[in-house]
Curated annotation (Swiss-Prot):
Residues annotated to bind 5-phospho-alpha-D-ribose 1-diphosphate: 26, 72-73, 98-99, 102, 104, 124-132
Family statement: Belongs to the purine/pyrimidine phosphoribosyltransferase family. PyrE subfamily.
Cofactor(s) the protein requires to work: Mg(2+)
Protein's UniProt name: Orotate phosphoribosyltransferase
A GO CC term assigned to this protein in UniProt: cytoplasm
Primary gene name: pyrE
Record text on subunit structure and interactions: Homodimer.
A molecular function (GO) term: orotate phosphoribosyltransferase activity
Organism classification: Bacteria, Pseudomonadati, Pseudomonadota, Gammaproteobacteria, Lysobacterales
Amino acid sequence: MSHYRQRFLQLALDSNALCFGEFTLKSGRISPYFFNAGHFNSGAKTAALAQCYADAIDAANMNFDLVFGPAYKGIPLATALACEYARRERDLLLAFNRKEVKNHGEGGTLIGAPLNGRKILIIDDVITAGTAIREVLRIIRNAGGTPTGIAVALNRQEIASETNRQSSVQALMAETGIPVVAIATLSDLLAFVEENASLAKFYEPLLAYKTHYGTEASD
C-alpha cells in the first residue's frame, strides 16, 4: 500500500474521522465502519489531509490548473489543497460555489477565480449517490470550465444495489469519462486493518461487508 494511503488512514483513525462498530447508513445498510471528514477539524489535521490529497492526485497524473470545492465540505478541502500545492511551489487557482444565490455585492453562486477556459479538479470528501457532483459538473460547464478530474478522500467501493453492481464512482466515470481518484479505498482500509494488530477484531466484519456490498471490479 502507498505511504500516503497509510498516512491518510492513520490520520483518519487518530482524528476519529474513521470509526469502527455498527453504523446504519442512509441506504439502510449496517456498515462496520463510518467515515466523517468533518473530524479533520484543526489546522494541523487539515494540512496533513491536504498532503495526502496532493500525493494521491500527483500519483494519478491529473491535468488541472484550478481547484474547485463544492459547498460545503469541499470548500475547506479545496482551500487547504491549493495551499499545499503553493507549498510545493505550484500556484493553482481556487474557486468554490455557494448553495444560496447572492443578489447583492458580487452576486451569483460562484466565488474565487473565473472558471472560463480552465481545467478544473473538483475536490470533495466522498461520492455517495453522485447527485451532488453531477450538479457541480453542470455548474462548472455552464461557467465555461472543463472538469478534468475529481478527487475524494475515501472510495467506499460499494454497489448501488443488488441489481446494479456498479458503484457510484464507477457509474459516474462511465457516464462522464472524468477520472476519479481517491486517497484510499475500502480495499485499502481492509489491508490497513489486517496489518494492524490493534484493529484485528474489525477485519472479519469488514471483509464480510466488502464481500456482500463491494464492487467486483476495482475503481
